[in-house]
Amino acid sequence: DVVARWMREAGMTVTEDALGTLRGRAGPGKRLLLGSHIDSVIDAGNYDGPLGVIVGILTVAHFHKLGWPLPFGIDVLAFGDEEGSRFPSTLSSSSAVAGIFQYDSLTTSDNHGVTFAEALKVFGKNAADIDKARYNPDDVLAYVETHIEQGPALEAANEPLGVVVGIVGQSRLRIVVTGEAGHAGTVPMPMRRDALAGAAEMVLFVETLARDHARDAMVATVGRI
């Protein structure tokens, strides 16, 4: 509600799509998309996401005061699900905008067994409307996002700004390791099928694999066991 109010105060008309993305629209013609996300994670970096949304709103407010001298319009997007904090999905809000939403993610569930589709209903949304979030590529000039640095590279180089030339693609996997319970003091080591030990080996393998491909900018994280 606060972000929507800021958008209106900046001179935009505001709508919300089926995945909770707020869209502030200003000016006629083809669209320049500005924005970022307003969801977060525990202990996120300061201004992670909101910076890009606020920069977009301030940009529109500036040109609105000038009587809109631009030959194109601006849409400010505030994505509601970038982090995938609740469900094991990736970038669902922006993927819908791009027209590549993965509908199988609607069957995934959170830690309480609530599915993505069920959560949308509680939020007053209809999954059947997700396709309506898509932009026609012919109507879009570009997408620009201002974001905080999420790694230490600029800080280590003592540089205030950087231009991003590429970002990592994101995939999430849920792996189930099934073992066999046995007495801790009497089952011989060669006969053990300890699921936790197997999972630990997998965690170390993922770490090693990413480090071996560090030159390719590969990263990998095991976030939950």
Which stretches of residues belong to each language-model region?
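A generic, well-ordered mixed alpha/beta core segment in the N-terminal half of proteins
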Residues: 42-112
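Midchain, well-structured core segments that form catalytic/ion-binding scaffolds
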Residues: 81-82, 86-225
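A general structural motif
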Residues: 29-31, 71, 139-141
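Beta-strand segments within the central parallel beta-sheet cores of soluble alpha/beta enzyme folds
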Residues: 19, 33, 69-80, 217-224
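General small-molecule cofactor/ligand-binding pocket signal
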Residues: 15, 77, 128
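Buried hydrophobic packing segments
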Residues: 3, 53-63, 199-202, 206
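Acidic/His- and Gly-rich active-site-bordering loop/insert found
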Residues: 1-45, 63
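Glycine-centered loop/turn motif at secondary-structure junctions
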Residues: 10-12, 67, 124
